[in-house]
Amino acid sequence: MTTTAKTDDIPIDTVILDIEGTVCPITFVKDTLFPYFIEKLPSILDKFQYPLSNTSASSDDQVLNILKQLPDNITKSSESIYKHFKNLVDQDIKDPILKSLQGLIWKQGYENNELQAPIYQDSVEFIESFPTKSSTNNKIYIYSSGSIKAQILLFGHVKSTTTTTTTTTTITNEVIDLNPKLNGYFDITTAGFKNQSNSYKKILQEINKSSTPKSVLFLSDNINEVNAAIEAGMKSYIVIRPGNPPIDDDDDGNDDKINHKIIYSLDELDL
């Protein structure tokens, strides 16, 4: 039997959501987005002449302008550029040039429906319903290590779901845009690293909640992020989803997850 997660003391009117492992399968980025980027990269690189140092970047060619930021020894051939980016992806290195190029290629994939974000149905329903659940104008924000541009793309192209009853199965082919339901976005460039309490204090300041941090709930699958949010004064729960890795001890080596509220679906929230 599922136990509804109740909040205490000050009512919660603001929820901040992590993405991977919280509202979206943790495998989506590594099993879908990263391979899509690597698959499309050769055809993108084949559009240009090499070495790129001899090629003029036009103001409207975003890809070429990004590639021109690479050192000359990398841009001497399409093969060397491909090898460079693949190495960064394989090692999960958060390189700004890589992220810029990934963002452009993913944007094309989302726009032609080759990519759709598999947001959990309970998360879709929560995002659609929570803002209008009371007259106090409840708010939802996103905080992810992925860029804000990538966050907006993801929530703007949410995969439709299949609804099954005892007698019928309804399949919708529409792509859902959840961005109108969201009040803002934060990433590591605008708020800071997610395992540091100062990042959450900065968010509280940005959303005018510094004086009432207990009215803000942060949801994440990462215990260190949850601890950092709590240290900043927020309420925070651990979210466990299928496929998520086991919850490790925190950065101090403490197995303190037993002291945290844990939910397995946003349906369990009683806000």
UniProtKB/Swiss-Prot annotation:
This is Enolase-phosphatase E1. Substrate binds at S144, S145, K194. It holds the Pfam family Hydrolase. Its main location: cytoplasm. NCBIfam families: enolase-ppase. Bifunctional enzyme that catalyzes the enolization of 2,3-diketo-5-methylthiopentyl-1-phosphate (DK-MTP-1-P) into the intermediate 2-hydroxy-3-keto-5-methylthiopentenyl-1-phosphate (HK-MTPenyl-1-P), which is then dephosphorylated to form the acireductone 1,2-dihydroxy-3-keto-5-methylthiopentene (DHK-MTPene). Mg(2+) binds at D18, E20, D221. Binds 1 Mg(2+) ion per subunit. Belongs to the HAD-like hydrolase superfamily. MasA/MtnC family. PANTHER family: ENOLASE-PHOSPHATASE E1. It comes from Candida albicans (strain WO-1). GO terms for cellular component: cytoplasm; nucleus. The gene is UTR4. It is found in: Cytoplasm; Nucleus.
